[in-house]
Amino acid sequence: MFLVGSLVVLCGLLAQSTAQLAGLPLPLGQGLPLPLGQGLPLPLGQGLPLAVSPALPSNPTDLLAGNFANALSGGLLSGGLLGILENIPLLDVIKSGGGSSNGLVGGLLGKLTSSVPLLNNILDIKITDPRLLELGLVQSPDGHRLYATIPLSLKLQVNMPVVGSFLQLAVKLNITAEIVAMKDNQGRIHLVLGDCTHSPGSLQITLLNGVTPVQSSLDSLTGILTKVLPELIQGKVCPLINGILSGLDVTLVHNIAELLIHGIQFVIKV
């Protein structure tokens, strides 16, 4: 009987001690006891990992503008834009006036040939090193249209005996394409090309190398190129854009078109 009573007292003391110890912090550097074979105590100063809330998914519309710009850029490159620009017979176009009086630049170039003797002294003009730079994308204030800026750079190698050497000119030009959403008679949504033209004032022509020619000759050449190049390059880029829009991913087209139709802004700056 005495032994049973002693055991009861001992168990009570142990239970009380355990309860008191449960309220005390663990000694510094001592981790929670783990079952054998299930790991080591946590390193000094490292507590138990806190529960982390899953990251909220980003707004899907945030990705649309970037995906669309990438699709346009990739389409222009895969469509052979750079090769098309490099193979433009620029001198023939200039001297032929675009092929006819109703051609790309009308009868302007024919008049230039007769009025500017410099053209008759140019043996060749070649387009080299064409590049497509990073596209820009903005949305109209009313949210119903997109404007894609297609920045291009290239070099012109001009063979002019009157100068005595090759001239190399750097050219930069932006083409701006308006893109709108349309529904056909069957209710299907499409992205279509609106206005497509060179951006006014975006043409830059810079002399890169060689002996500086007589200023009047350089001014005359620059004046001719300023009248010819923008429309010529525009005529190569815009049809490609039109074809790219008709071949874009259906889901991408639908998502963008829905936002444009309802005037929802989704382009911040691309």
UniProtKB/Swiss-Prot annotation:
Annotated GO CC locations: extracellular region; extracellular space; microvillus
Residues covered by region (Important for surfactant activity and antibacterial properties): 104-109
Tissue: Detected in adult nasal epithelium, heart, lung, spleen, testis and salivary gland, and in embryonic nasal epithelium, lung, salivary gland and thymus.
UniProt-listed Gene3D superfamilies: Bactericidal permeability-increasing protein, domain 1
Expression induction or repression: After bulbectomy or lesion of the olfactory bulb.
Keywords: Antibiotic, Antimicrobial, Disulfide bond, Glycoprotein, Immunity, Innate immunity, Lipid-binding, Secreted, Signal
Record-level Gene Ontology MF annotations: lipid binding
Residues of this chain annotated as glycosylated in UniProt: 174
Domain of life: Eukaryota
Disulfide topology: 196-238
Record GO biological process: antibacterial humoral response; antimicrobial humoral immune response mediated by antimicrobial peptide; immune response in nasopharyngeal-associated lymphoid tissue; innate immune response; multicellular organismal-level water homeostasis; negative regulation of single-species biofilm formation in or on host organism; regulation of sodium ion transmembrane transport; surfactant homeostasis
Stretch forming the signal peptide: 1-19
Cellular localisation: Secreted
Functional description taken from the UniProt entry: Lipid-binding protein which shows high specificity for the surfactant phospholipid dipalmitoylphosphatidylcholine (DPPC). Plays a role in the innate immune responses of the upper airways. Reduces the surface tension in secretions from airway epithelia and inhibits the formation of biofilm by pathogenic Gram-negative bacteria, such as P.aeruginosa and K.pneumoniae. Negatively regulates proteolytic cleavage of SCNN1G, an event that is required for activation of the epithelial sodium channel (ENaC), and thereby contributes to airway surface liquid homeostasis and proper clearance of mucus.
Family designation: Belongs to the BPI/LBP/Plunc superfamily. Plunc family.
PANTHER family documented for this protein: BPI FOLD-CONTAINING FAMILY A MEMBER 1 (PTHR47015:SF1)
Assembly, per entry: Monomer. Interacts (via N-terminus) with SCNN1B, a subunit of the heterotrimeric epithelial sodium channel (ENaC); this inhibits proteolytic activation of ENaC.
Protein name, entry field: BPI fold-containing family A member 1
Lineage: Eukaryota, Metazoa, Chordata, Craniata, Vertebrata
